[in-house]
């Protein structure tokens, strides 16, 4: 027997295992089998232990059951999709399809399984499409199948469409865990596919159920598409709900993606919001005549219909119109043309009505009123009539159609709309008028509030002004009282100007006060006198003992006043041409009887001048007022210094009677008596004496001032400069002549003063020194000295000079022991030689000490 024929016979009689066979050799076989194949009844062969062949055998004839089972017709996919049972012919003569499919299957043996359902579900489908044990190994590591790679899009969490991306990228992201089953994905229509998911968003979970692959659905989808395009039998397991999917003809299309669509594609597009394109027909006139129809707008009188009636009427018309007018889609092309024209006219009408509604708001802003609206409507009316006339002509030319009742219903609808718009227009006008009134009322209220606020502000300003004026008046009154207190001592001398002789004032002190100031002072003095006379009970600040002492001091001063022998006039302005020589020694060595007789003569001479009791009482009252004011304003020292320099009528009379005598007699008795009885003023104020006060009282020397007395002598004159006299004279003994040493110390002090004084041009140092030496030597006169220096010098340091001046003056006055005053010392000559010393008669003539 030929061995080749025996081998062919063995291969032909191989027992083929069906799908339910338990043979181990065929359990993992991928060779397609058929359940309806006839099983051969023969004993087992050696081929049963080897296994089934895995490559097509060239010895198998075309009429074999294997080839018939392996060959699937091209329309198997379509038959399965439509739900019809798959009919596979047993004798199929197309071996090329089987060879191509088997070779393709063996090339992609490691690719993932398409479906995971068991083959028992689909008994008529080849079992190589299913894998009961799960997906094939290494399914995620294989590249996508060659030939076709799908393009996918997806919607991200923000609602944005991302993509398109290839199958490889989508597979990697899916395996990386970036995609969830609820992700919306869409496959672009690059090629036909059997599931009908092109250009449609589905969830990723739906795709996995379609391809029955949960590990890599994208690659599995591409495998299924390739099988379908290569005419490989492929059955997609579909559920009972999706078995009636419309089948599509599988037409090979080039893998070219473009955003340009054809007309048919545009009509088939559907967007996410459900919109789509559809065909419409629009009538375009050929003759070029453009006719627009405008509905007739009724007059204003027709607009007064209530809103309820118009709304009900419009509802009726719209309901009737809906019943009569067919839908736009069901209408014929001619009717669609009519509808398009009506749509244009309605849009024109609504635009015009909107413009009419908008006009009143602009007119309201421009505040032109409702009259202009009426004018606008009157202007629009002829245009509407012309349009209606043209419309009638055009309708007469056109043939009558069946849609005349529809046109009438449209007109009714337009009239209803016009009435509604008119009603809205009126309501808008009323609302705007109400807003106008409300705004005007608000403006009036705001204006009233502003006026009230302005009035309040003005009232507050007036109150403030009144308060300020009251304060200023009070300050002026205080200043007047202060001026009165400082100027009380000036009135007696001004009243007795007729009897006194005018003195020659210094050039810097020769300032005439204005008459208005004197008038104010005199009027204020009169008011004070009236008030003092009207007051019956007063509260004295001092005890009765102080009053008695003050009266005693005044009497003693009046009794101890002597006749001055100095020349009349002030020594401030002119320096004496001839030196004054005083025989101090002879005067000191006089007998006490002579001094007593001299005092008696003075008393006899002054006997005629007696103090008046009424004047003394007035002085007491004024003294009490002055003490009150000094405690409040702290002006005691300034008043004392001022009063001490005021001349009295008696002293002026004595000066007039002794103008020719140029010698001065120094009385030791009077000086000692004053020093013993006069109290020391301990509380001297530091207030500043004005220059006007100093100028008005700077006409007489201090020696003359201390000896003047009269009925009109001012208050406190007995206590002027008490410390100077107390320090100069010791009451315990009669002073003896100190010699030239005491006088030389005075001259040294004056020389130092002259060297330090750097005054302005025209100011004599002696005049300034005389004024400064008339002040008390204590620290209370420091500021007065400093102010005086500042007023007469632009280069000196007034405060420093004041401290040095007071210090040196106190040192000088502690060492000197003579009855001379500083004014007398200033009147002495000065020079480089010692001729300024006092000439005393001695043993040898011409000898100078």
From Swiss-Prot:
Please tell me the species this chain comes from. Saccharomyces cerevisiae (strain ATCC 204508 / S288c) (Baker's yeast)
Query: What biological process terms from GO does the record include?
Result: nuclear pore localization
Q: What else is known?
A: Present with 830 molecules/cell in log phase SD medium.
List the residue ranges of the region (Disordered). Answer: 305-505, 527-547, 593-612, 634-661
Compositional bias of type Basic and acidic residues: which residue ranges? Answer: 319-331, 361-375, 387-403, 425-443, 456-479
Lineage: superkingdom: Eukaryota
Q: Which chain positions lie within coiled-coil regions? A: 410-484
Compositional bias, Low complexity, is annotated for: 308-318, 644-661
Give all residue intervals belonging to the GYF domain.
149-205
UniProt name for this protein: SMY2 homolog 2
User: Basic residues: which segments have biased composition?
Assistant: 444-455
The family note in this entry says: Belongs to the SMY2/mpd2 family.
InterPro entries attached to this UniProt entry:
GRB10-interact_GYF (IPR051640), GYF (IPR003169), GYF-like_dom_sf (IPR035445)
Modified positions (Phosphothreonine) are 350
Keywords on record: Coiled coil, Cytoplasm, Phosphoprotein
Identify the PROSITE patterns for this entry: GYF (PS50829)
- Which locations, inside or outside the cell, does it occupy? Cytoplasm
Q: Which PANTHER family match?
A: FI03272P-RELATED, GRB10 INTERACTING GYF PROTEIN
Q: How does it assemble?
A: Interacts with ribosomes. Interacts with EAP1 and MSL5 (via the GYP domain).
What ranges does the record list as Polar residues composition bias?
483-505, 594-605
In the UniProt record, what gene is named as encoding this protein?
SYH1
**UniProt cross-references to Pfam families, sorted A to Z:** GYF
What are its GO cellular component terms? cytoplasm; cytosol; mitochondrion
